[in-house]
């Protein structure tokens, strides 16, 4: 994330101790004037000089400091990730001491009532030398996937006497996306490809060459067949690598994520519907992530939410990253958009053997609202998984 150029002026405020010293200085000064005692005038001047030094040091310490954040490539909900906050001191001679940086994060939602602001995260930088940088890290865990925004970093210092607090705010606005949590698939998930559970272990250990042509190498993973270890490349790389084969088109899974809007005004029902929606999104994200990382097949996902989209033929981690970002931002709109998503799939494939629909409503509700005589029918069979009815528990265990 880009650094912020700190041209914001530094403001100073009295601390409790500073107010006490200021009160003492005024009291001593008034007493010295009334009594005409020179020693009291000197004492009052000394106290005021200390406050003046404190004010100048606070202001000069923070001027010129810039902040910079580093985030991981991918972040998932309910899984902690580290945020690096880097402070750079470009000044030639003056360092910075006892700088407290406070960060805050806000969950950005289409529903204003759902927006949440985190507690302030404080990090103390004991010393930042001239022309140097200092790094602090903090761990962040989000309970929901979606878009988040930094509200800005506030740098403060009370150095050297703690009588005044220098404050320099840094404008926020930087956003980042937290991808859905990745759960675990049960062995029964292979049924979605038309593979019987009894043959699951056999299919996992079979040679990948039965499914296509050799096209590259990849790192060895537990469960891979030793028959396909490429020994020459393994010796050269000093690690086990195996041959990788192009998957057959028959192992393509076409998924439609149906985020049906809730029409109920009851808050408890809406909260329950939101949980089912998040469960459906996490299941599709886990499915796509597993297929892309295991080189098992190809997956195409169409999302029927407020803005229907389609992401086709995901078969690598780099491709699945974009899909996970899109799933993180998926949310139901005010209207049913499943017909628009079906149109996107129909234009992409023309004909589909098996269409898997992951929905937040029962199939009966879909059939009652869409007349089969007028709706687009381009699939030979349909597998309907209703998250609200617990259909996903057979194939999926959510992340804790």
Residues covered by each model-derived region:
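A generic hydrophobic-helix recognition signal that picks specific residues
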Residues: 28-29, 251, 353
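Alpha-helical structural motif
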Residues: 25, 48, 213, 227, ...
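Acidic, glycine-rich A-domain
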Residues: 289-400
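Secondary-structure junction/capping motif
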Residues: 9-15, 275, 336-340, 391
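An amphipathic, basic-hydrophobic helix/alpha-beta surface used to engage anionic
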Residues: 39, 49-310
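Extracellular/lumenal glycan-associated context and N-glycosylation machinery
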Residues: 1-68
